[in-house]
Regions:
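Flexible, acidic/Gly-rich N-terminal and inter-domain linker regions that tether
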Residues: 1-42
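Conserved acidic functional residues
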Residues: 48-50, 203, 281
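Broad gene-expression machinery/nucleic-acid interaction feature
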Residues: 42-44, 160, 303-305
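Conserved non-cysteine loop/helix-boundary elements of the Radical SAM core domain that shape
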Residues: 63-266
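Canonical Radical SAM [4Fe-4S] cluster-binding loop centered on the CxxxCxxC motif
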Residues: 40-75
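Beta-strand scaffold of nucleotide-dependent catalytic cores
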Residues: 48, 162, 231-235, 306, ...
């Protein structure tokens, strides 16, 4: 089916408005190129660092900021390293190929340079990082980024970092509890570029409290001028665990036209500047019910994002709050994936007492044997 016919079908049979039909079609075509490289022996690894310097008021992720919990980081890394050893050993025993590694959080660069060296060094011991399609360090908060940390990341083979401002309006940043300024972001972005790490992602959020079309479009224009390889545009979403729900009931002030104008602006301007949409997903309770879209320069797609969202291969996760997703996407299943999940304890204290990794490894092996993948 041609691209034109796909868009026409989405519009006529599924009542998708033309601009969204075009967006969905463009994303699908880009994802097809990536998904087409996957087979049943491929997998990725997610490494959870669930600590942050402060907690954003809209955040509902597993992340901890108190000094008492931050003091757990040294012990956490030792426990995490042991779990990674067992997980990678199982991956090797099963004959799987690791395509991507993603270190997320939380804020992974809350680790010191020495702690980061310990973690990245351990991963380098366990897998050939030079053979990875992509190796991401989700740095996130600009106020945790230093040249020394990114030098360590580059030394150990990291190919993609995330430097996430969310907004370049200081009033908006202050209002959502971010402990950095727009200048801090610009400094961190320069550090990332000078590090020689080839791919930089920046996250932005449409519809943050106190934001407007004027301030958001200014933010987006400034980001475009920096030419990051990836720009991920999220629509503001508040979940039950978010602090902002206790602060104000008026959190969807951009429910109407401004949010839509901001979303449309990102899609128009990104295209004009040579970016293409490569992945997309929806969440509940977003401002204006809009989508989250990842844009990239040609050839700079964030491959882990596609593998994870489209559930085309297994992702083995280690760390507090981490969830492994084992996937069999073989033709004999009629095109429908068989998916099983394995959960680590949510809280760092519980994780440090957890001894279930051996059970998870056996579950991994049982899944692949049951699906006749080994």
């Amino acid at each position: 089916m041609s691209k034109t016919r796909v868009k026409r079908t989405l519009a006529s049979e599924y009542f998708v408005i033309p601009k969204k039909a075009a967006l969905a079609t463009d994303v699908a075509l880009c994802e097809q190129k990536i998904i087409g490289t996957v087979d049943g022996r491929d997998c990725s690894v997610y490494v959870a660092i669930p600590f942050c310097p402060t907690r954003c008021s809209y955040c509902s992720f597993v992340s901890y900021t108190s000094k008492k919990l931050l003091s757990l980081i040294p012990d956490y890394l030792i426990h995490l390293a042991a779990d990674l050893e067992k997980t990678f050993a199982a991956i090797n025993e099963l004959g799987l190929r690791v395509k991507t590694v993603y270190i997320g959080g939380g804020t992974p660069t809350i680790l010191t340079a020495d702690q980061l060296r310990f973690l990245l060094g351990k991963i380098a011991e366990l897998t050939d990082v030079t053979a990875l399609e992509e190796y991401t360090l989700e740095s996130g908060r600009p106020d945790t980024i230093t040249a020394e940390k990114f030098a360590v990341a580059k030394e150990y083979g990291v190919t993609r970092v995330c430097v996430n401002p969310q907004s370049l309006c200081d009033e908006v940043l202050h209002g959502i509890g971010r402990s950095h300024t727009s200048e801090d972001f610009l400094r961190a972005f320069e550090i990332a570029r000078e590090s020689g790490i080839p791919y930089i992602n920046t996250d932005l959020i449409v519809g943050l409290p106190g934001d407007s079309f004027k301030t958001f479009s200014s933010t987006f224009d400034r980001i475009l001028a920096l030419r990051p390889e990836n720009i991920t545009v999220h629509t503001f979403c508040v979940k039950k665990a978010a602090e902002i729900l206790r602060q104000s009931s008026d959190i969807y002030s951009l429910r109407g036209g401004d949010a839509g104008k901001c979303v449309d602006y990102t899609q128009l301007k990104s295209q004009q500047e040579g970016y293409i949409p490569y992945y997309m997903y929806r969440q509940k309770n977003t401002v204006g019910n809009f989508e989250n879209v990842g844009f990239c320069l040609e050839g700079a797609e964030g491959r882990y994002n596609v593998y994870m969202m489209e559930e085309v291969h297994s992702i083995f996760a280690c760390g507090a709050g981490a969830v492994s997703k084992m996937v069999n996407y073989q033709p004999e299943n009629g095109g429908k994936p068989v998916i099983e999940r394995l959960f680590y304890p949510k809280y760092p204290y519980e994780y440090l007492r957890d001894e279930s990794t051996d059970e998870k490894v056996e579950a991994m092996k049982a899944f692949y044997r049951a699906q006749r993948l080994i």
